[in-house]
Design a protein with these regions (language model features):
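Bacterial N-terminal signal peptides that target proteins for export
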Residues: 1-9
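Sec/Tat signal peptide C-region and signal peptidase I cleavage site
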Residues: 16-23
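A contiguous strand-loop segment
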Residues: 24-140, 160-289
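Short, well-ordered beta-strand elements within core beta-sheets of diverse protein domains
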Residues: 144-150
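Short, well-structured alpha-helical segments that form the helix of a local strand-helix-strand
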Residues: 156-166, 302-306
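Accessory, solvent-exposed terminal regions and/or long lumenal/extracellular loops of proteins
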Residues: 266-322, 326-331, 416-418, 424-435
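Substrate-recognition/cap regions that form aromatic- and gly/pro-loop-enriched pockets
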Residues: 317-441
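Histidine-centered catalytic/metal-binding microenvironments
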Residues: 416-493
Length: 493
């Protein structure tokens, strides 16, 4: 009886967390400033640990099957699907978690990459003027998968997003990114029906926390798209703000005041990519969305930025006794990803999804190409809605438990785990480009399945080894023994 009560309470917490604890960090590098000439779209998916359970799945193509309807897991949102929908690889949340599917990151057979969302913040005036449509609207819980199934270009993603929001409304303040061979788009959704999109420059980079970033916005520019009421709605309601150039300032119109929670991440990303233009940090200083980096940006740098806890600075929580500091490398990461778009490849091979499960500080980024036909069963296993439970056979839970143990003591436990996965990623970064050049979907699938199985086996083994290391070295606090000895050496897998 008590066990059931505890489980019910935990599930209730999980349900609340699924609704309100989503808070991510986004990143971007244009093809002219990335190390390998690809477009890079990155994002951490940050939520409560109880909901840190995602899958890797391959959704099949459906050919000439009219009459199908896309249904949200979260609310009453419905959308009629075209007769043919595209195959795509994605990282959805387990159905048992509740709160919607949240495909999170998708790459499809048409060479389109989609990530969503980074949660933004909308001010009270905007929310009152155009409330979010939570009962039947679309949002991060449904839109990424719908777009991946229906869209053959990034521009089609923006257009369909606009049509869906106009007809159904949106559930919350969110930021999306879409990319293809020719262009990439950054989209901010401010209210139930108002949104703006800007074409992302090929020669710049970006990093931002949970805040809207678009300042001066010209609706007539060929590099922008927006909802019909983006400017007229706030103008009529009396809260439109214009900049010195006479154009709408979307941040000042739709967003509340800046906070350290989000703005420090934005500044730290700028300092990482372009230290000479980052300037000194100030809570109330808006940062530029796009800027020229001081160097070429690659996968490794994005991976490590997603892991950072501001080591070596006065804001590192562990070094400075500041447990409340919001780092980019938070323990609440459910999954993280970097999507790459290689314009030189045929469309079905063009996009690769590099993803990790659990807190990426102590797990591994693995590449999955859009052309693969399967993921290992442990990565693709779902749970029935409303029946969320711990099951270490599910890959995300195996990785999450390892990360949870490693982060209890980053000096003695975590460093060795992090170094192990770092070496594994180096192997993938060296091997994968050559494999991709074969343009062989069967070989890519075989390689991916083998890599997934090896990573999972190692995660389970390292967890067992680390648990024994902790036990053998008497590092479990509060055991009553009074032992104070330090281990002879940090844990090494």
């Amino acid at each position: 009886m008590m066990k059931n009560l505890i489980l019910s309470a935990c599930l209730a917490v999980a349900a609340v967390a699924a609704e309100c604890a989503v808070a991510c960090t986004g990143m971007y590098a244009g093809r002219k400033v990335s190390e390998d000439g690809t477009v890079l779209l990155g994002r951490t998916v940050d939520t409560a640990p109880w909901t840190s359970s995602h899958m890797y799945v391959v959704e099949p193509r459906h050919e000439n099957e009219p009459g199908r309807v896309f249904r949200s897991w979260k609310n009453d949102f419905r959308w009629n699907l075209p007769a043919t929908t595209w195959k795509f690889v994605s990282t959805p949340r387990l159905r048992s978690i509740g709160g919607g599917r949240m495909d999170s990151a998708c790459v499809n057979e048409k060479g389109v990459a989609i990530t969503g969302t980074v949660t933004g913040r909308t001010n009270e005036k905007a929310q009152k003027a155009d409330p979010f449509v939570r009962g039947s609207g679309t949002g991060e819980e449904s839109l990424p998968g719908l777009l991946a199934a229906c869209c053959a270009t990034a521009r089609e993603c923006v257009d369909l997003l606009g049509r869906v929001i106009a007809e159904k409304g949106h559930t919350g303040p969110e930021i999306y990114m879409f990319g293809d061979r020719d262009e990439a788009w950054y989209v901010e959704v401010y209210t139930g029906h108002e949104w703006a999109a800007v074409r992302m420059p090929e020669d710049k980079v970006a990093c931002w926390g949970n805040q809207f970033m678009i300042r001066s916005f010209d609706p007539s520019s060929p590099d922008t798209l927006c909802s019909p009421g983006l400017v007229s709605m706030p103008e009529k309601a009396g809260f439109l703000v214009k900049g010195a150039d006479g154009l709408p300032d979307l941040y000042r119109t739709y967003a509340p005041e800046l906070t350290d929670y989000s703005n420090y991440r934005t500044w730290f990303g700028h300092r990482t990519f372009a230290p000479e233009t980052a300037g000194e940090y100030a809570t109330d200083r808006p940062m530029e969305l796009f800027y020229v980096p001081s160097h070429k940006v690659g996968y490794r740098e994005m991976f490590e930025l997603m892991r950072t806890r501001y080591e070596g600075t006065d804001r590192n929580p562990e070094e400075n006794g500041l447990p409340g500091v919001r780092t980019i490398g938070t323990t609440k990461q459910a999954t993280s990803h970097v999507l790459s778009i290689d314009a030189s490849l045929p469309e079905r091979f063009r996009c690769t999804l590099w993803a990790s499960l659990g807190n990426c500080e102590h797990t591994v980024f693995l590449p999955m190409n859009a052309a693969i036909t399967a993921c290992d069963e442990a990565y693709a296993t779902d749970q029935t809605e409303g029946e969320f439970r711990y099951d270490a056979r599910i890959a995300s839970m195996a990785f999450r438990r390892l990360a949870a143990l490693a982060e209890k003591d980053r000096r003695w436990y975590g460093r060795g785990v992090r170094d192990f996965w770092h070496a594994r990623e180096d192997t993938y970064l060296a091997e994968y480009p050559g494999l991709l050049k074969t343009l062989d979907a069967a070989k890519l699938t075989e390689w991916t399945l083998a890599a997934q199985r090896k990573d999972l086996a190692d995660a389970r083994r390292i967890f067992d080894d680390l648990a024994w290391y902790i036990t053998a070295n008497n590092r479990i606090e509060g055991d009553g023994s009074g032992a104070t000895n330090e281990p002879p050496a940090p844990f090494k897998p």
